Design a protein with these regions (language model features):
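Residues within well-ordered beta-strands of beta-sheet-rich folds
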Residues: 78-80, 127-129, 182-187, 234-238, ...
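Secretome/extracellular-domain signature
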Residues: 107-167, 332-436
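Conserved beta-structured recognition patch
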Residues: 151-165, 175-232, 306, 379-527
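Solvent-exposed serine/threonine-rich low-complexity stretches and specific carbohydrate-binding patches
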Residues: 321-335
Length: 543
């Protein structure tokens, strides 16, 4: 049996890119050595201000006294103040600044200046002479020590601070990069959930759907004893690190004041069904063999509580053309050819909590004609869509999904009456091309609050509505795999029913099936554990 993950598919291409990139670097270094001697410099002046990105890269694990020679001719740094000591929750005496300058990356640095740090406010723009100071890591935090207050010049106030949304997993993977920067941990819940009497004080893990990160609150913080912690919120704050005896950095997130916390919801919004995978392009002809995989988060009797699944195919030949005037129901306006959307009604059968079920073609085979039968699996709705129109809308078609180019996707809805205003309970998209969203007219495909999408802009001050795919930050999508290879797209993650959220966001793993592949390959841990990936590639787990 053959199985390739998307990561594995990229190895060869990435290796070649590294070879090319390293060759370019070698050539650039050689040319620079030959042609950039100081006496031959063709003009210009070295900036007095060293980017914080470059400053941090000077540190190699030992204290470094800074001077013009090791700072490439510079003597100072500049940045925007992000520290706010009014809440008494930041390391005492640290002035923390960040800069968005080099390579489009945000980098920050901390400067211990004692009580004077409290005199600066977020948004102050400062220039700091650091010649003669020492770059060192103290208490786990990289700092510029030995800077006097007189070396700091405030040149402006009220400068905007970027709302930098960062996944907790990225912070944990690269703690040095995010240290001393202002970040937003979005859609975060306490894990484990806290009691109503809990306070902020101490270390509490929060989860944003990517990983857990520690929310740290000093016992002396002005809000340490505040109660009624939020069920789901955005936590703005500054990342600081702790360092163990082996030099390993562990990040923690510190809000500055309670103004850094933005509540999103007070009760769980549990999806009764979640999308866990799809077969959009079997080996051979697709017609009647495409299928979608789901998992129930509770017992459902579809005869009592009906659902529906809608597939959208935005290939150039689908009808009607242009933006989806009726959203997911746009296929109802097609009269000939392939319709833009196609619907399956789920009105019979039952499914238990944690059970997989399928919707799709009547072929019920794992990888197209002549492959392993899936007829014994739980199929809630299956019919030959090459011969029959959809349930309510959608014209018969040889392919539900596009295999490349413009975007395709599918969503599951509670109920069978779908119109322009109907929101799904879960949705995924593959690709982003085509006429999908028109901001001026408000036409598009509606999304749900998931690990991928948000119905409001969680970083906006007034939670601006973003109800459609490609509106606001709703730009995430899965990718198309190589055509006609028989890739099943496994979407593995962890969904917490009690919290109504993804504790680990879904990851697309493309498994190249054969005609004899077993059901366990798309429902179990496959590929299995390895030295590189000890957990293997499991399907979505309901917690």
């Amino acid at each position: 049996m053959v199985a390739k993950t998307i990561d594995q598919l990229k190895i060869k291409d990435t290796h070649m890119k590294k070879i090319i990139f390293n060759s370019i670097i070698l050539l650039a270094v050689t040319l620079g050595w030959l042609g950039c001697k100081k006496e031959n410099y063709p003009g210009g002046t070295v900036s007095s201000y060293l980017p914080i990105y470059d400053l941090r890269n000077l540190y190699k694990g030992v204290d470094l006294t800074l001077n013009a020679d090791n700072m490439f001719g510079s003597t100072s740094v500049e940045g925007i103040v992000i520290s706010d000591h009014s809440g008494h929750n930041l390391p005492s005496g640290l002035l923390v600044i960040e800069q968005y300058r080099r390579l489009g990356l945000v980098r920050g640095i901390s400067i211990p200046i004692g009580a004077a740090a409290a005199e600066y406010a977020p948004g102050d723009s400062v220039q700091i002479n650091i010649a003669g100071s020492v770059l060192k890591r103290l208490d786990g935090i990289l700092q510029i020590t030995g800077v006097s207050s007189s070396a700091i010049t405030k040149i402006a106030t009220g400068r905007p601070i970027p709302k930098n949304r960062v996944a907790s997993s990225k912070i944990k993977e690269n703690p040095n990069d995010y240290e001393s920067t202002f970040v937003a941990i979005v859609k975060a819940s306490f894990d484990p959930a806290v009691e109503s009497t809990a306070t902020y004080a101490g270390d509490k893990p929060i989860n944003d759907g990517f990983d857990n990160i520690t929310l740290h609150t000093e016992a002396t913080a002005t809000f340490a004893n505040a109660r009624n912690l939020n069920f789901n919120a955005v936590y703005y704050g500054i990342v600081f690190n702790k360092q163990d005896v082996n030099g390993k950095l562990t990040p923690e997130h510190r809000i500055r004041t309670l103004k850094d916390v933005k509540a999103l919801s007070s009760v769980p919004e549990v999806a009764p069904v979640i999308i866990t995978g799809y077969m959009a392009d079997v080996k051979g002809g697709d017609g009647n063999y495409e299928y979608m995989q789901f998992k129930a988060t509770k017992f459902i009797d579809f005869s009592v509580t009906p659902y529906s699944v809608v597939v959208t195919n935005n290939a150039g030949a689908t009808n009607p053309t242009g933006f989806p005037t009726l959203g997911w129901a746009t296929g109802s306006r097609a009269t000939t050819g392939n319709s833009r959307t196609f619907k399956f009604n789920l009105t019979s059968g039952t499914v238990n909590k944690g059970e997989f079920f399928y919707v799709g073609g009547a072929g019920k085979m794992i990888n197209g004609s002549g492959s392993t039968s899936m007829s014994s699996s739980k199929w809630i709705r299956a019919f030959d869509y090459t011969k029959s129109d959809g349930d309510g809308f959608g014209l018969k078609t040889t392919g539900l999904f596009a295999n490349s180019g413009n975007a395709s996707g599918f969503a599951i809805f509670e109920g069978t009456e779908i119109d322009v205003n109907t929101d799904p309970v879960d949705v995924v998209f593959i690709g982003s091309g085509g006429s999908l969203y028109n901001a001026e007219t408000g036409l598009g495909y509606r999304v749900a609050n998931t690990d991928l999408y948000d119905k409001v802009d969680v970083l906006s001050d007034n939670l601006k509505p973003t109800p459609f795919y490609l509106s606001g930050t709703n730009t995430m999508n899965f990718i198309y795999t190589e055509a006609d290879k028989g890739y099943f797209n496994k979407l593995g993650g962890i969904y917490d029913v009690a919290l109504g959220k993804w504790m680990k966001a879904r990851r697309q793993v493309a498994i190249e099936l054969t005609k004899t592949s077993a059901l366990s390959e798309i429902e179990g841990v496959f590929p299995g554990p390895s030295e590189e990936n000890p957990e293997g590639y499991p399907s979505t787990v309901i917690k």
